[in-house]
Amino acid sequence: MATERIRLGTLLTPAARHRPWDLASRVASVDRLSGGRVTLGVGLGALHGNWLAFEADEGRAVRARKLDEVLDVYAGLLGGQPFSYTGEYFSASPVTELVPPPPVQTPHPPVWCVGLMVPGRSRQRSLERAARWQGVFPAIAGGSLENPGSQLTPPALRELVERLGALRAEAGQTMQGYDVV
């Protein structure tokens, strides 16, 4: 028996800790193998001893900037057009062909981002990032280690989705086809 509808995805890839060209290549490979059914889920990545045993913490701000660059390169490499990039952390000389072959989904497999809403803060950078892509893993700041989702109440989720809708509208996009996971 084989499935034809189930999607494959990551929960959660700390993309800032990956080389964007390697990540794009791996996601494209799985997309082709699955017949176009992969989704890339990304976030900054929680810090814990396992990560810190291999690398120093660069801080949230650096990881956030790296994540934005990784996603820019990911979209550019898988977009089916010649691509080059120069950023603070990553660069790519003009690329005209990606090996392995391009993904099935165009312009690229969808990206779902953690969208953290911090109550009382006017600028929500995590939500701004999530609004630029195809879906969000909603999170509300203020949970505890024992109950990390404790602040994700129905009214808080409604506010988060409304903010995402406003951000997408500012960019000329709608919420149609946008996933809230």
Describe each model-derived feature in a short phrase.
Residues 1-181:
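Active-site-adjacent structural elements that line small-molecule/cofactor binding pockets in enzymes
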